[in-house]
Amino acid sequence: MAGQRTCQKKSSRAGPKKMQEPPKSIEEFLKFQNWDYWPREIHFRDDDEWSCTLKKIKEDSSFVSIYTHLWENVPRIFEALLIMESKLKEYSLILQNHTSKIFKWKSMISETSSYRKLERYGEFLKKYHKKKKIMLSDEMETEKNIEGCSFTGFKANELTKLPRHLDAERIYLFILKAHNFDERVFKIWKTHFLSEASIALLHDSFWWWFLHKFRPDRENQDCLFDRISESYVTLFMSIPLSRKDAFFQIYPDCLAQAIYATFHEAFPESSYLFNDEFKEDLGNTIFLWCSGLKPQKGFWTHWKLKELSTTTIHGSKKAPAKSVKERIADSQERITTTIDFNIIKILNNPRAYVLPISKEESGLSRLTTKTASSLLCPHMAERMSSGIFFFL
């Protein structure tokens, strides 16, 4: 009993035992179980071969080897961009190599005083350059009436020029400015109106209407109409979808105005022919071509082209129109200078002395005949009128 008590006293004095910590790794666990000798004591045949294989496995399973293998064999999304970048670098080096061998501009041209003057002159021309205007004075020897103009014939690969050297671009600009469009809208419409297809439409439409009204020629009219339709399709396809509706609401009216202005500019002496009926027929035709519908009657009343009777599209004043007396005098002068009054020749070949007359002169001849008939007896008037139409 005494021995037990002494042991209890010793144990109480020693205090509680410290608990052993659990193993934290596989090596500690093996050591704790007294298995630390395994598998080091296991011996395989051909130890060198196994160690080499193990080394290869370790190398092949490393991060670097896996990344390299994937980089070389797996297709990448940005591979095309990388190839392009490398090619651009290569080409930039080639370009730098070539540019380094080119002479500098200053070493090729000596900076003399004459060169400086030439440079200043070039800058002056760029600053003050304007498009050349062709303005026809009334003294120029060009035909100013319908009778003196003729269509030279349709050419498949070439537009027929407008009469009296008129410029289609100038005519379109004149029409656009008359509409007083906003500056931004004007710039947009200007690019479309001055396009190649729109210029072709004005040329061919003018000549088609000229032939239709004054010189009927079915073959040339058909050729012109075919090209008009092709040009219209080209223009239609060239207009962006966002502007198409707005543009083709104004285009037929502007084209009709441009054709009307061209007739006024080309034939100022025949301006009396370009009356309200002329404008109505012209507009109806152009609108039917472009939209398939006729415009409202009297649509031309909003046209701001009244000044064309006295002023050209360039702003210069026109010569005053000839009076009826002046037209009669011109007609009589033409008759006296072109008709041979040798009665024997006339009787032998009467058809050779029949002259083609204009609508203007035919109207004047009717006017003079009616005036003479009212002053003479019926028999004399009848003979006189028959004589006038015989000679004319």
From Swiss-Prot:
<dbReference type="InterPro" id="IPR029417">
    <property type="entry name" value="FAM227"/>
</dbReference>
<protein>
    <recommendedName>
        <fullName>Protein FAM227B</fullName>
    </recommendedName>
</protein>
<feature type="region of interest" description="Disordered">
    <location>
        <begin position="1"/>
        <end position="23"/>
    </location>
</feature>
<feature type="compositionally biased region" description="Basic residues">
    <location>
        <begin position="7"/>
        <end position="16"/>
    </location>
</feature>
<dbReference type="Pfam" id="PF14922">
    <property type="entry name" value="FWWh"/>
</dbReference>
<comment type="similarity">
    <text>Belongs to the FAM227 family.</text>
</comment>
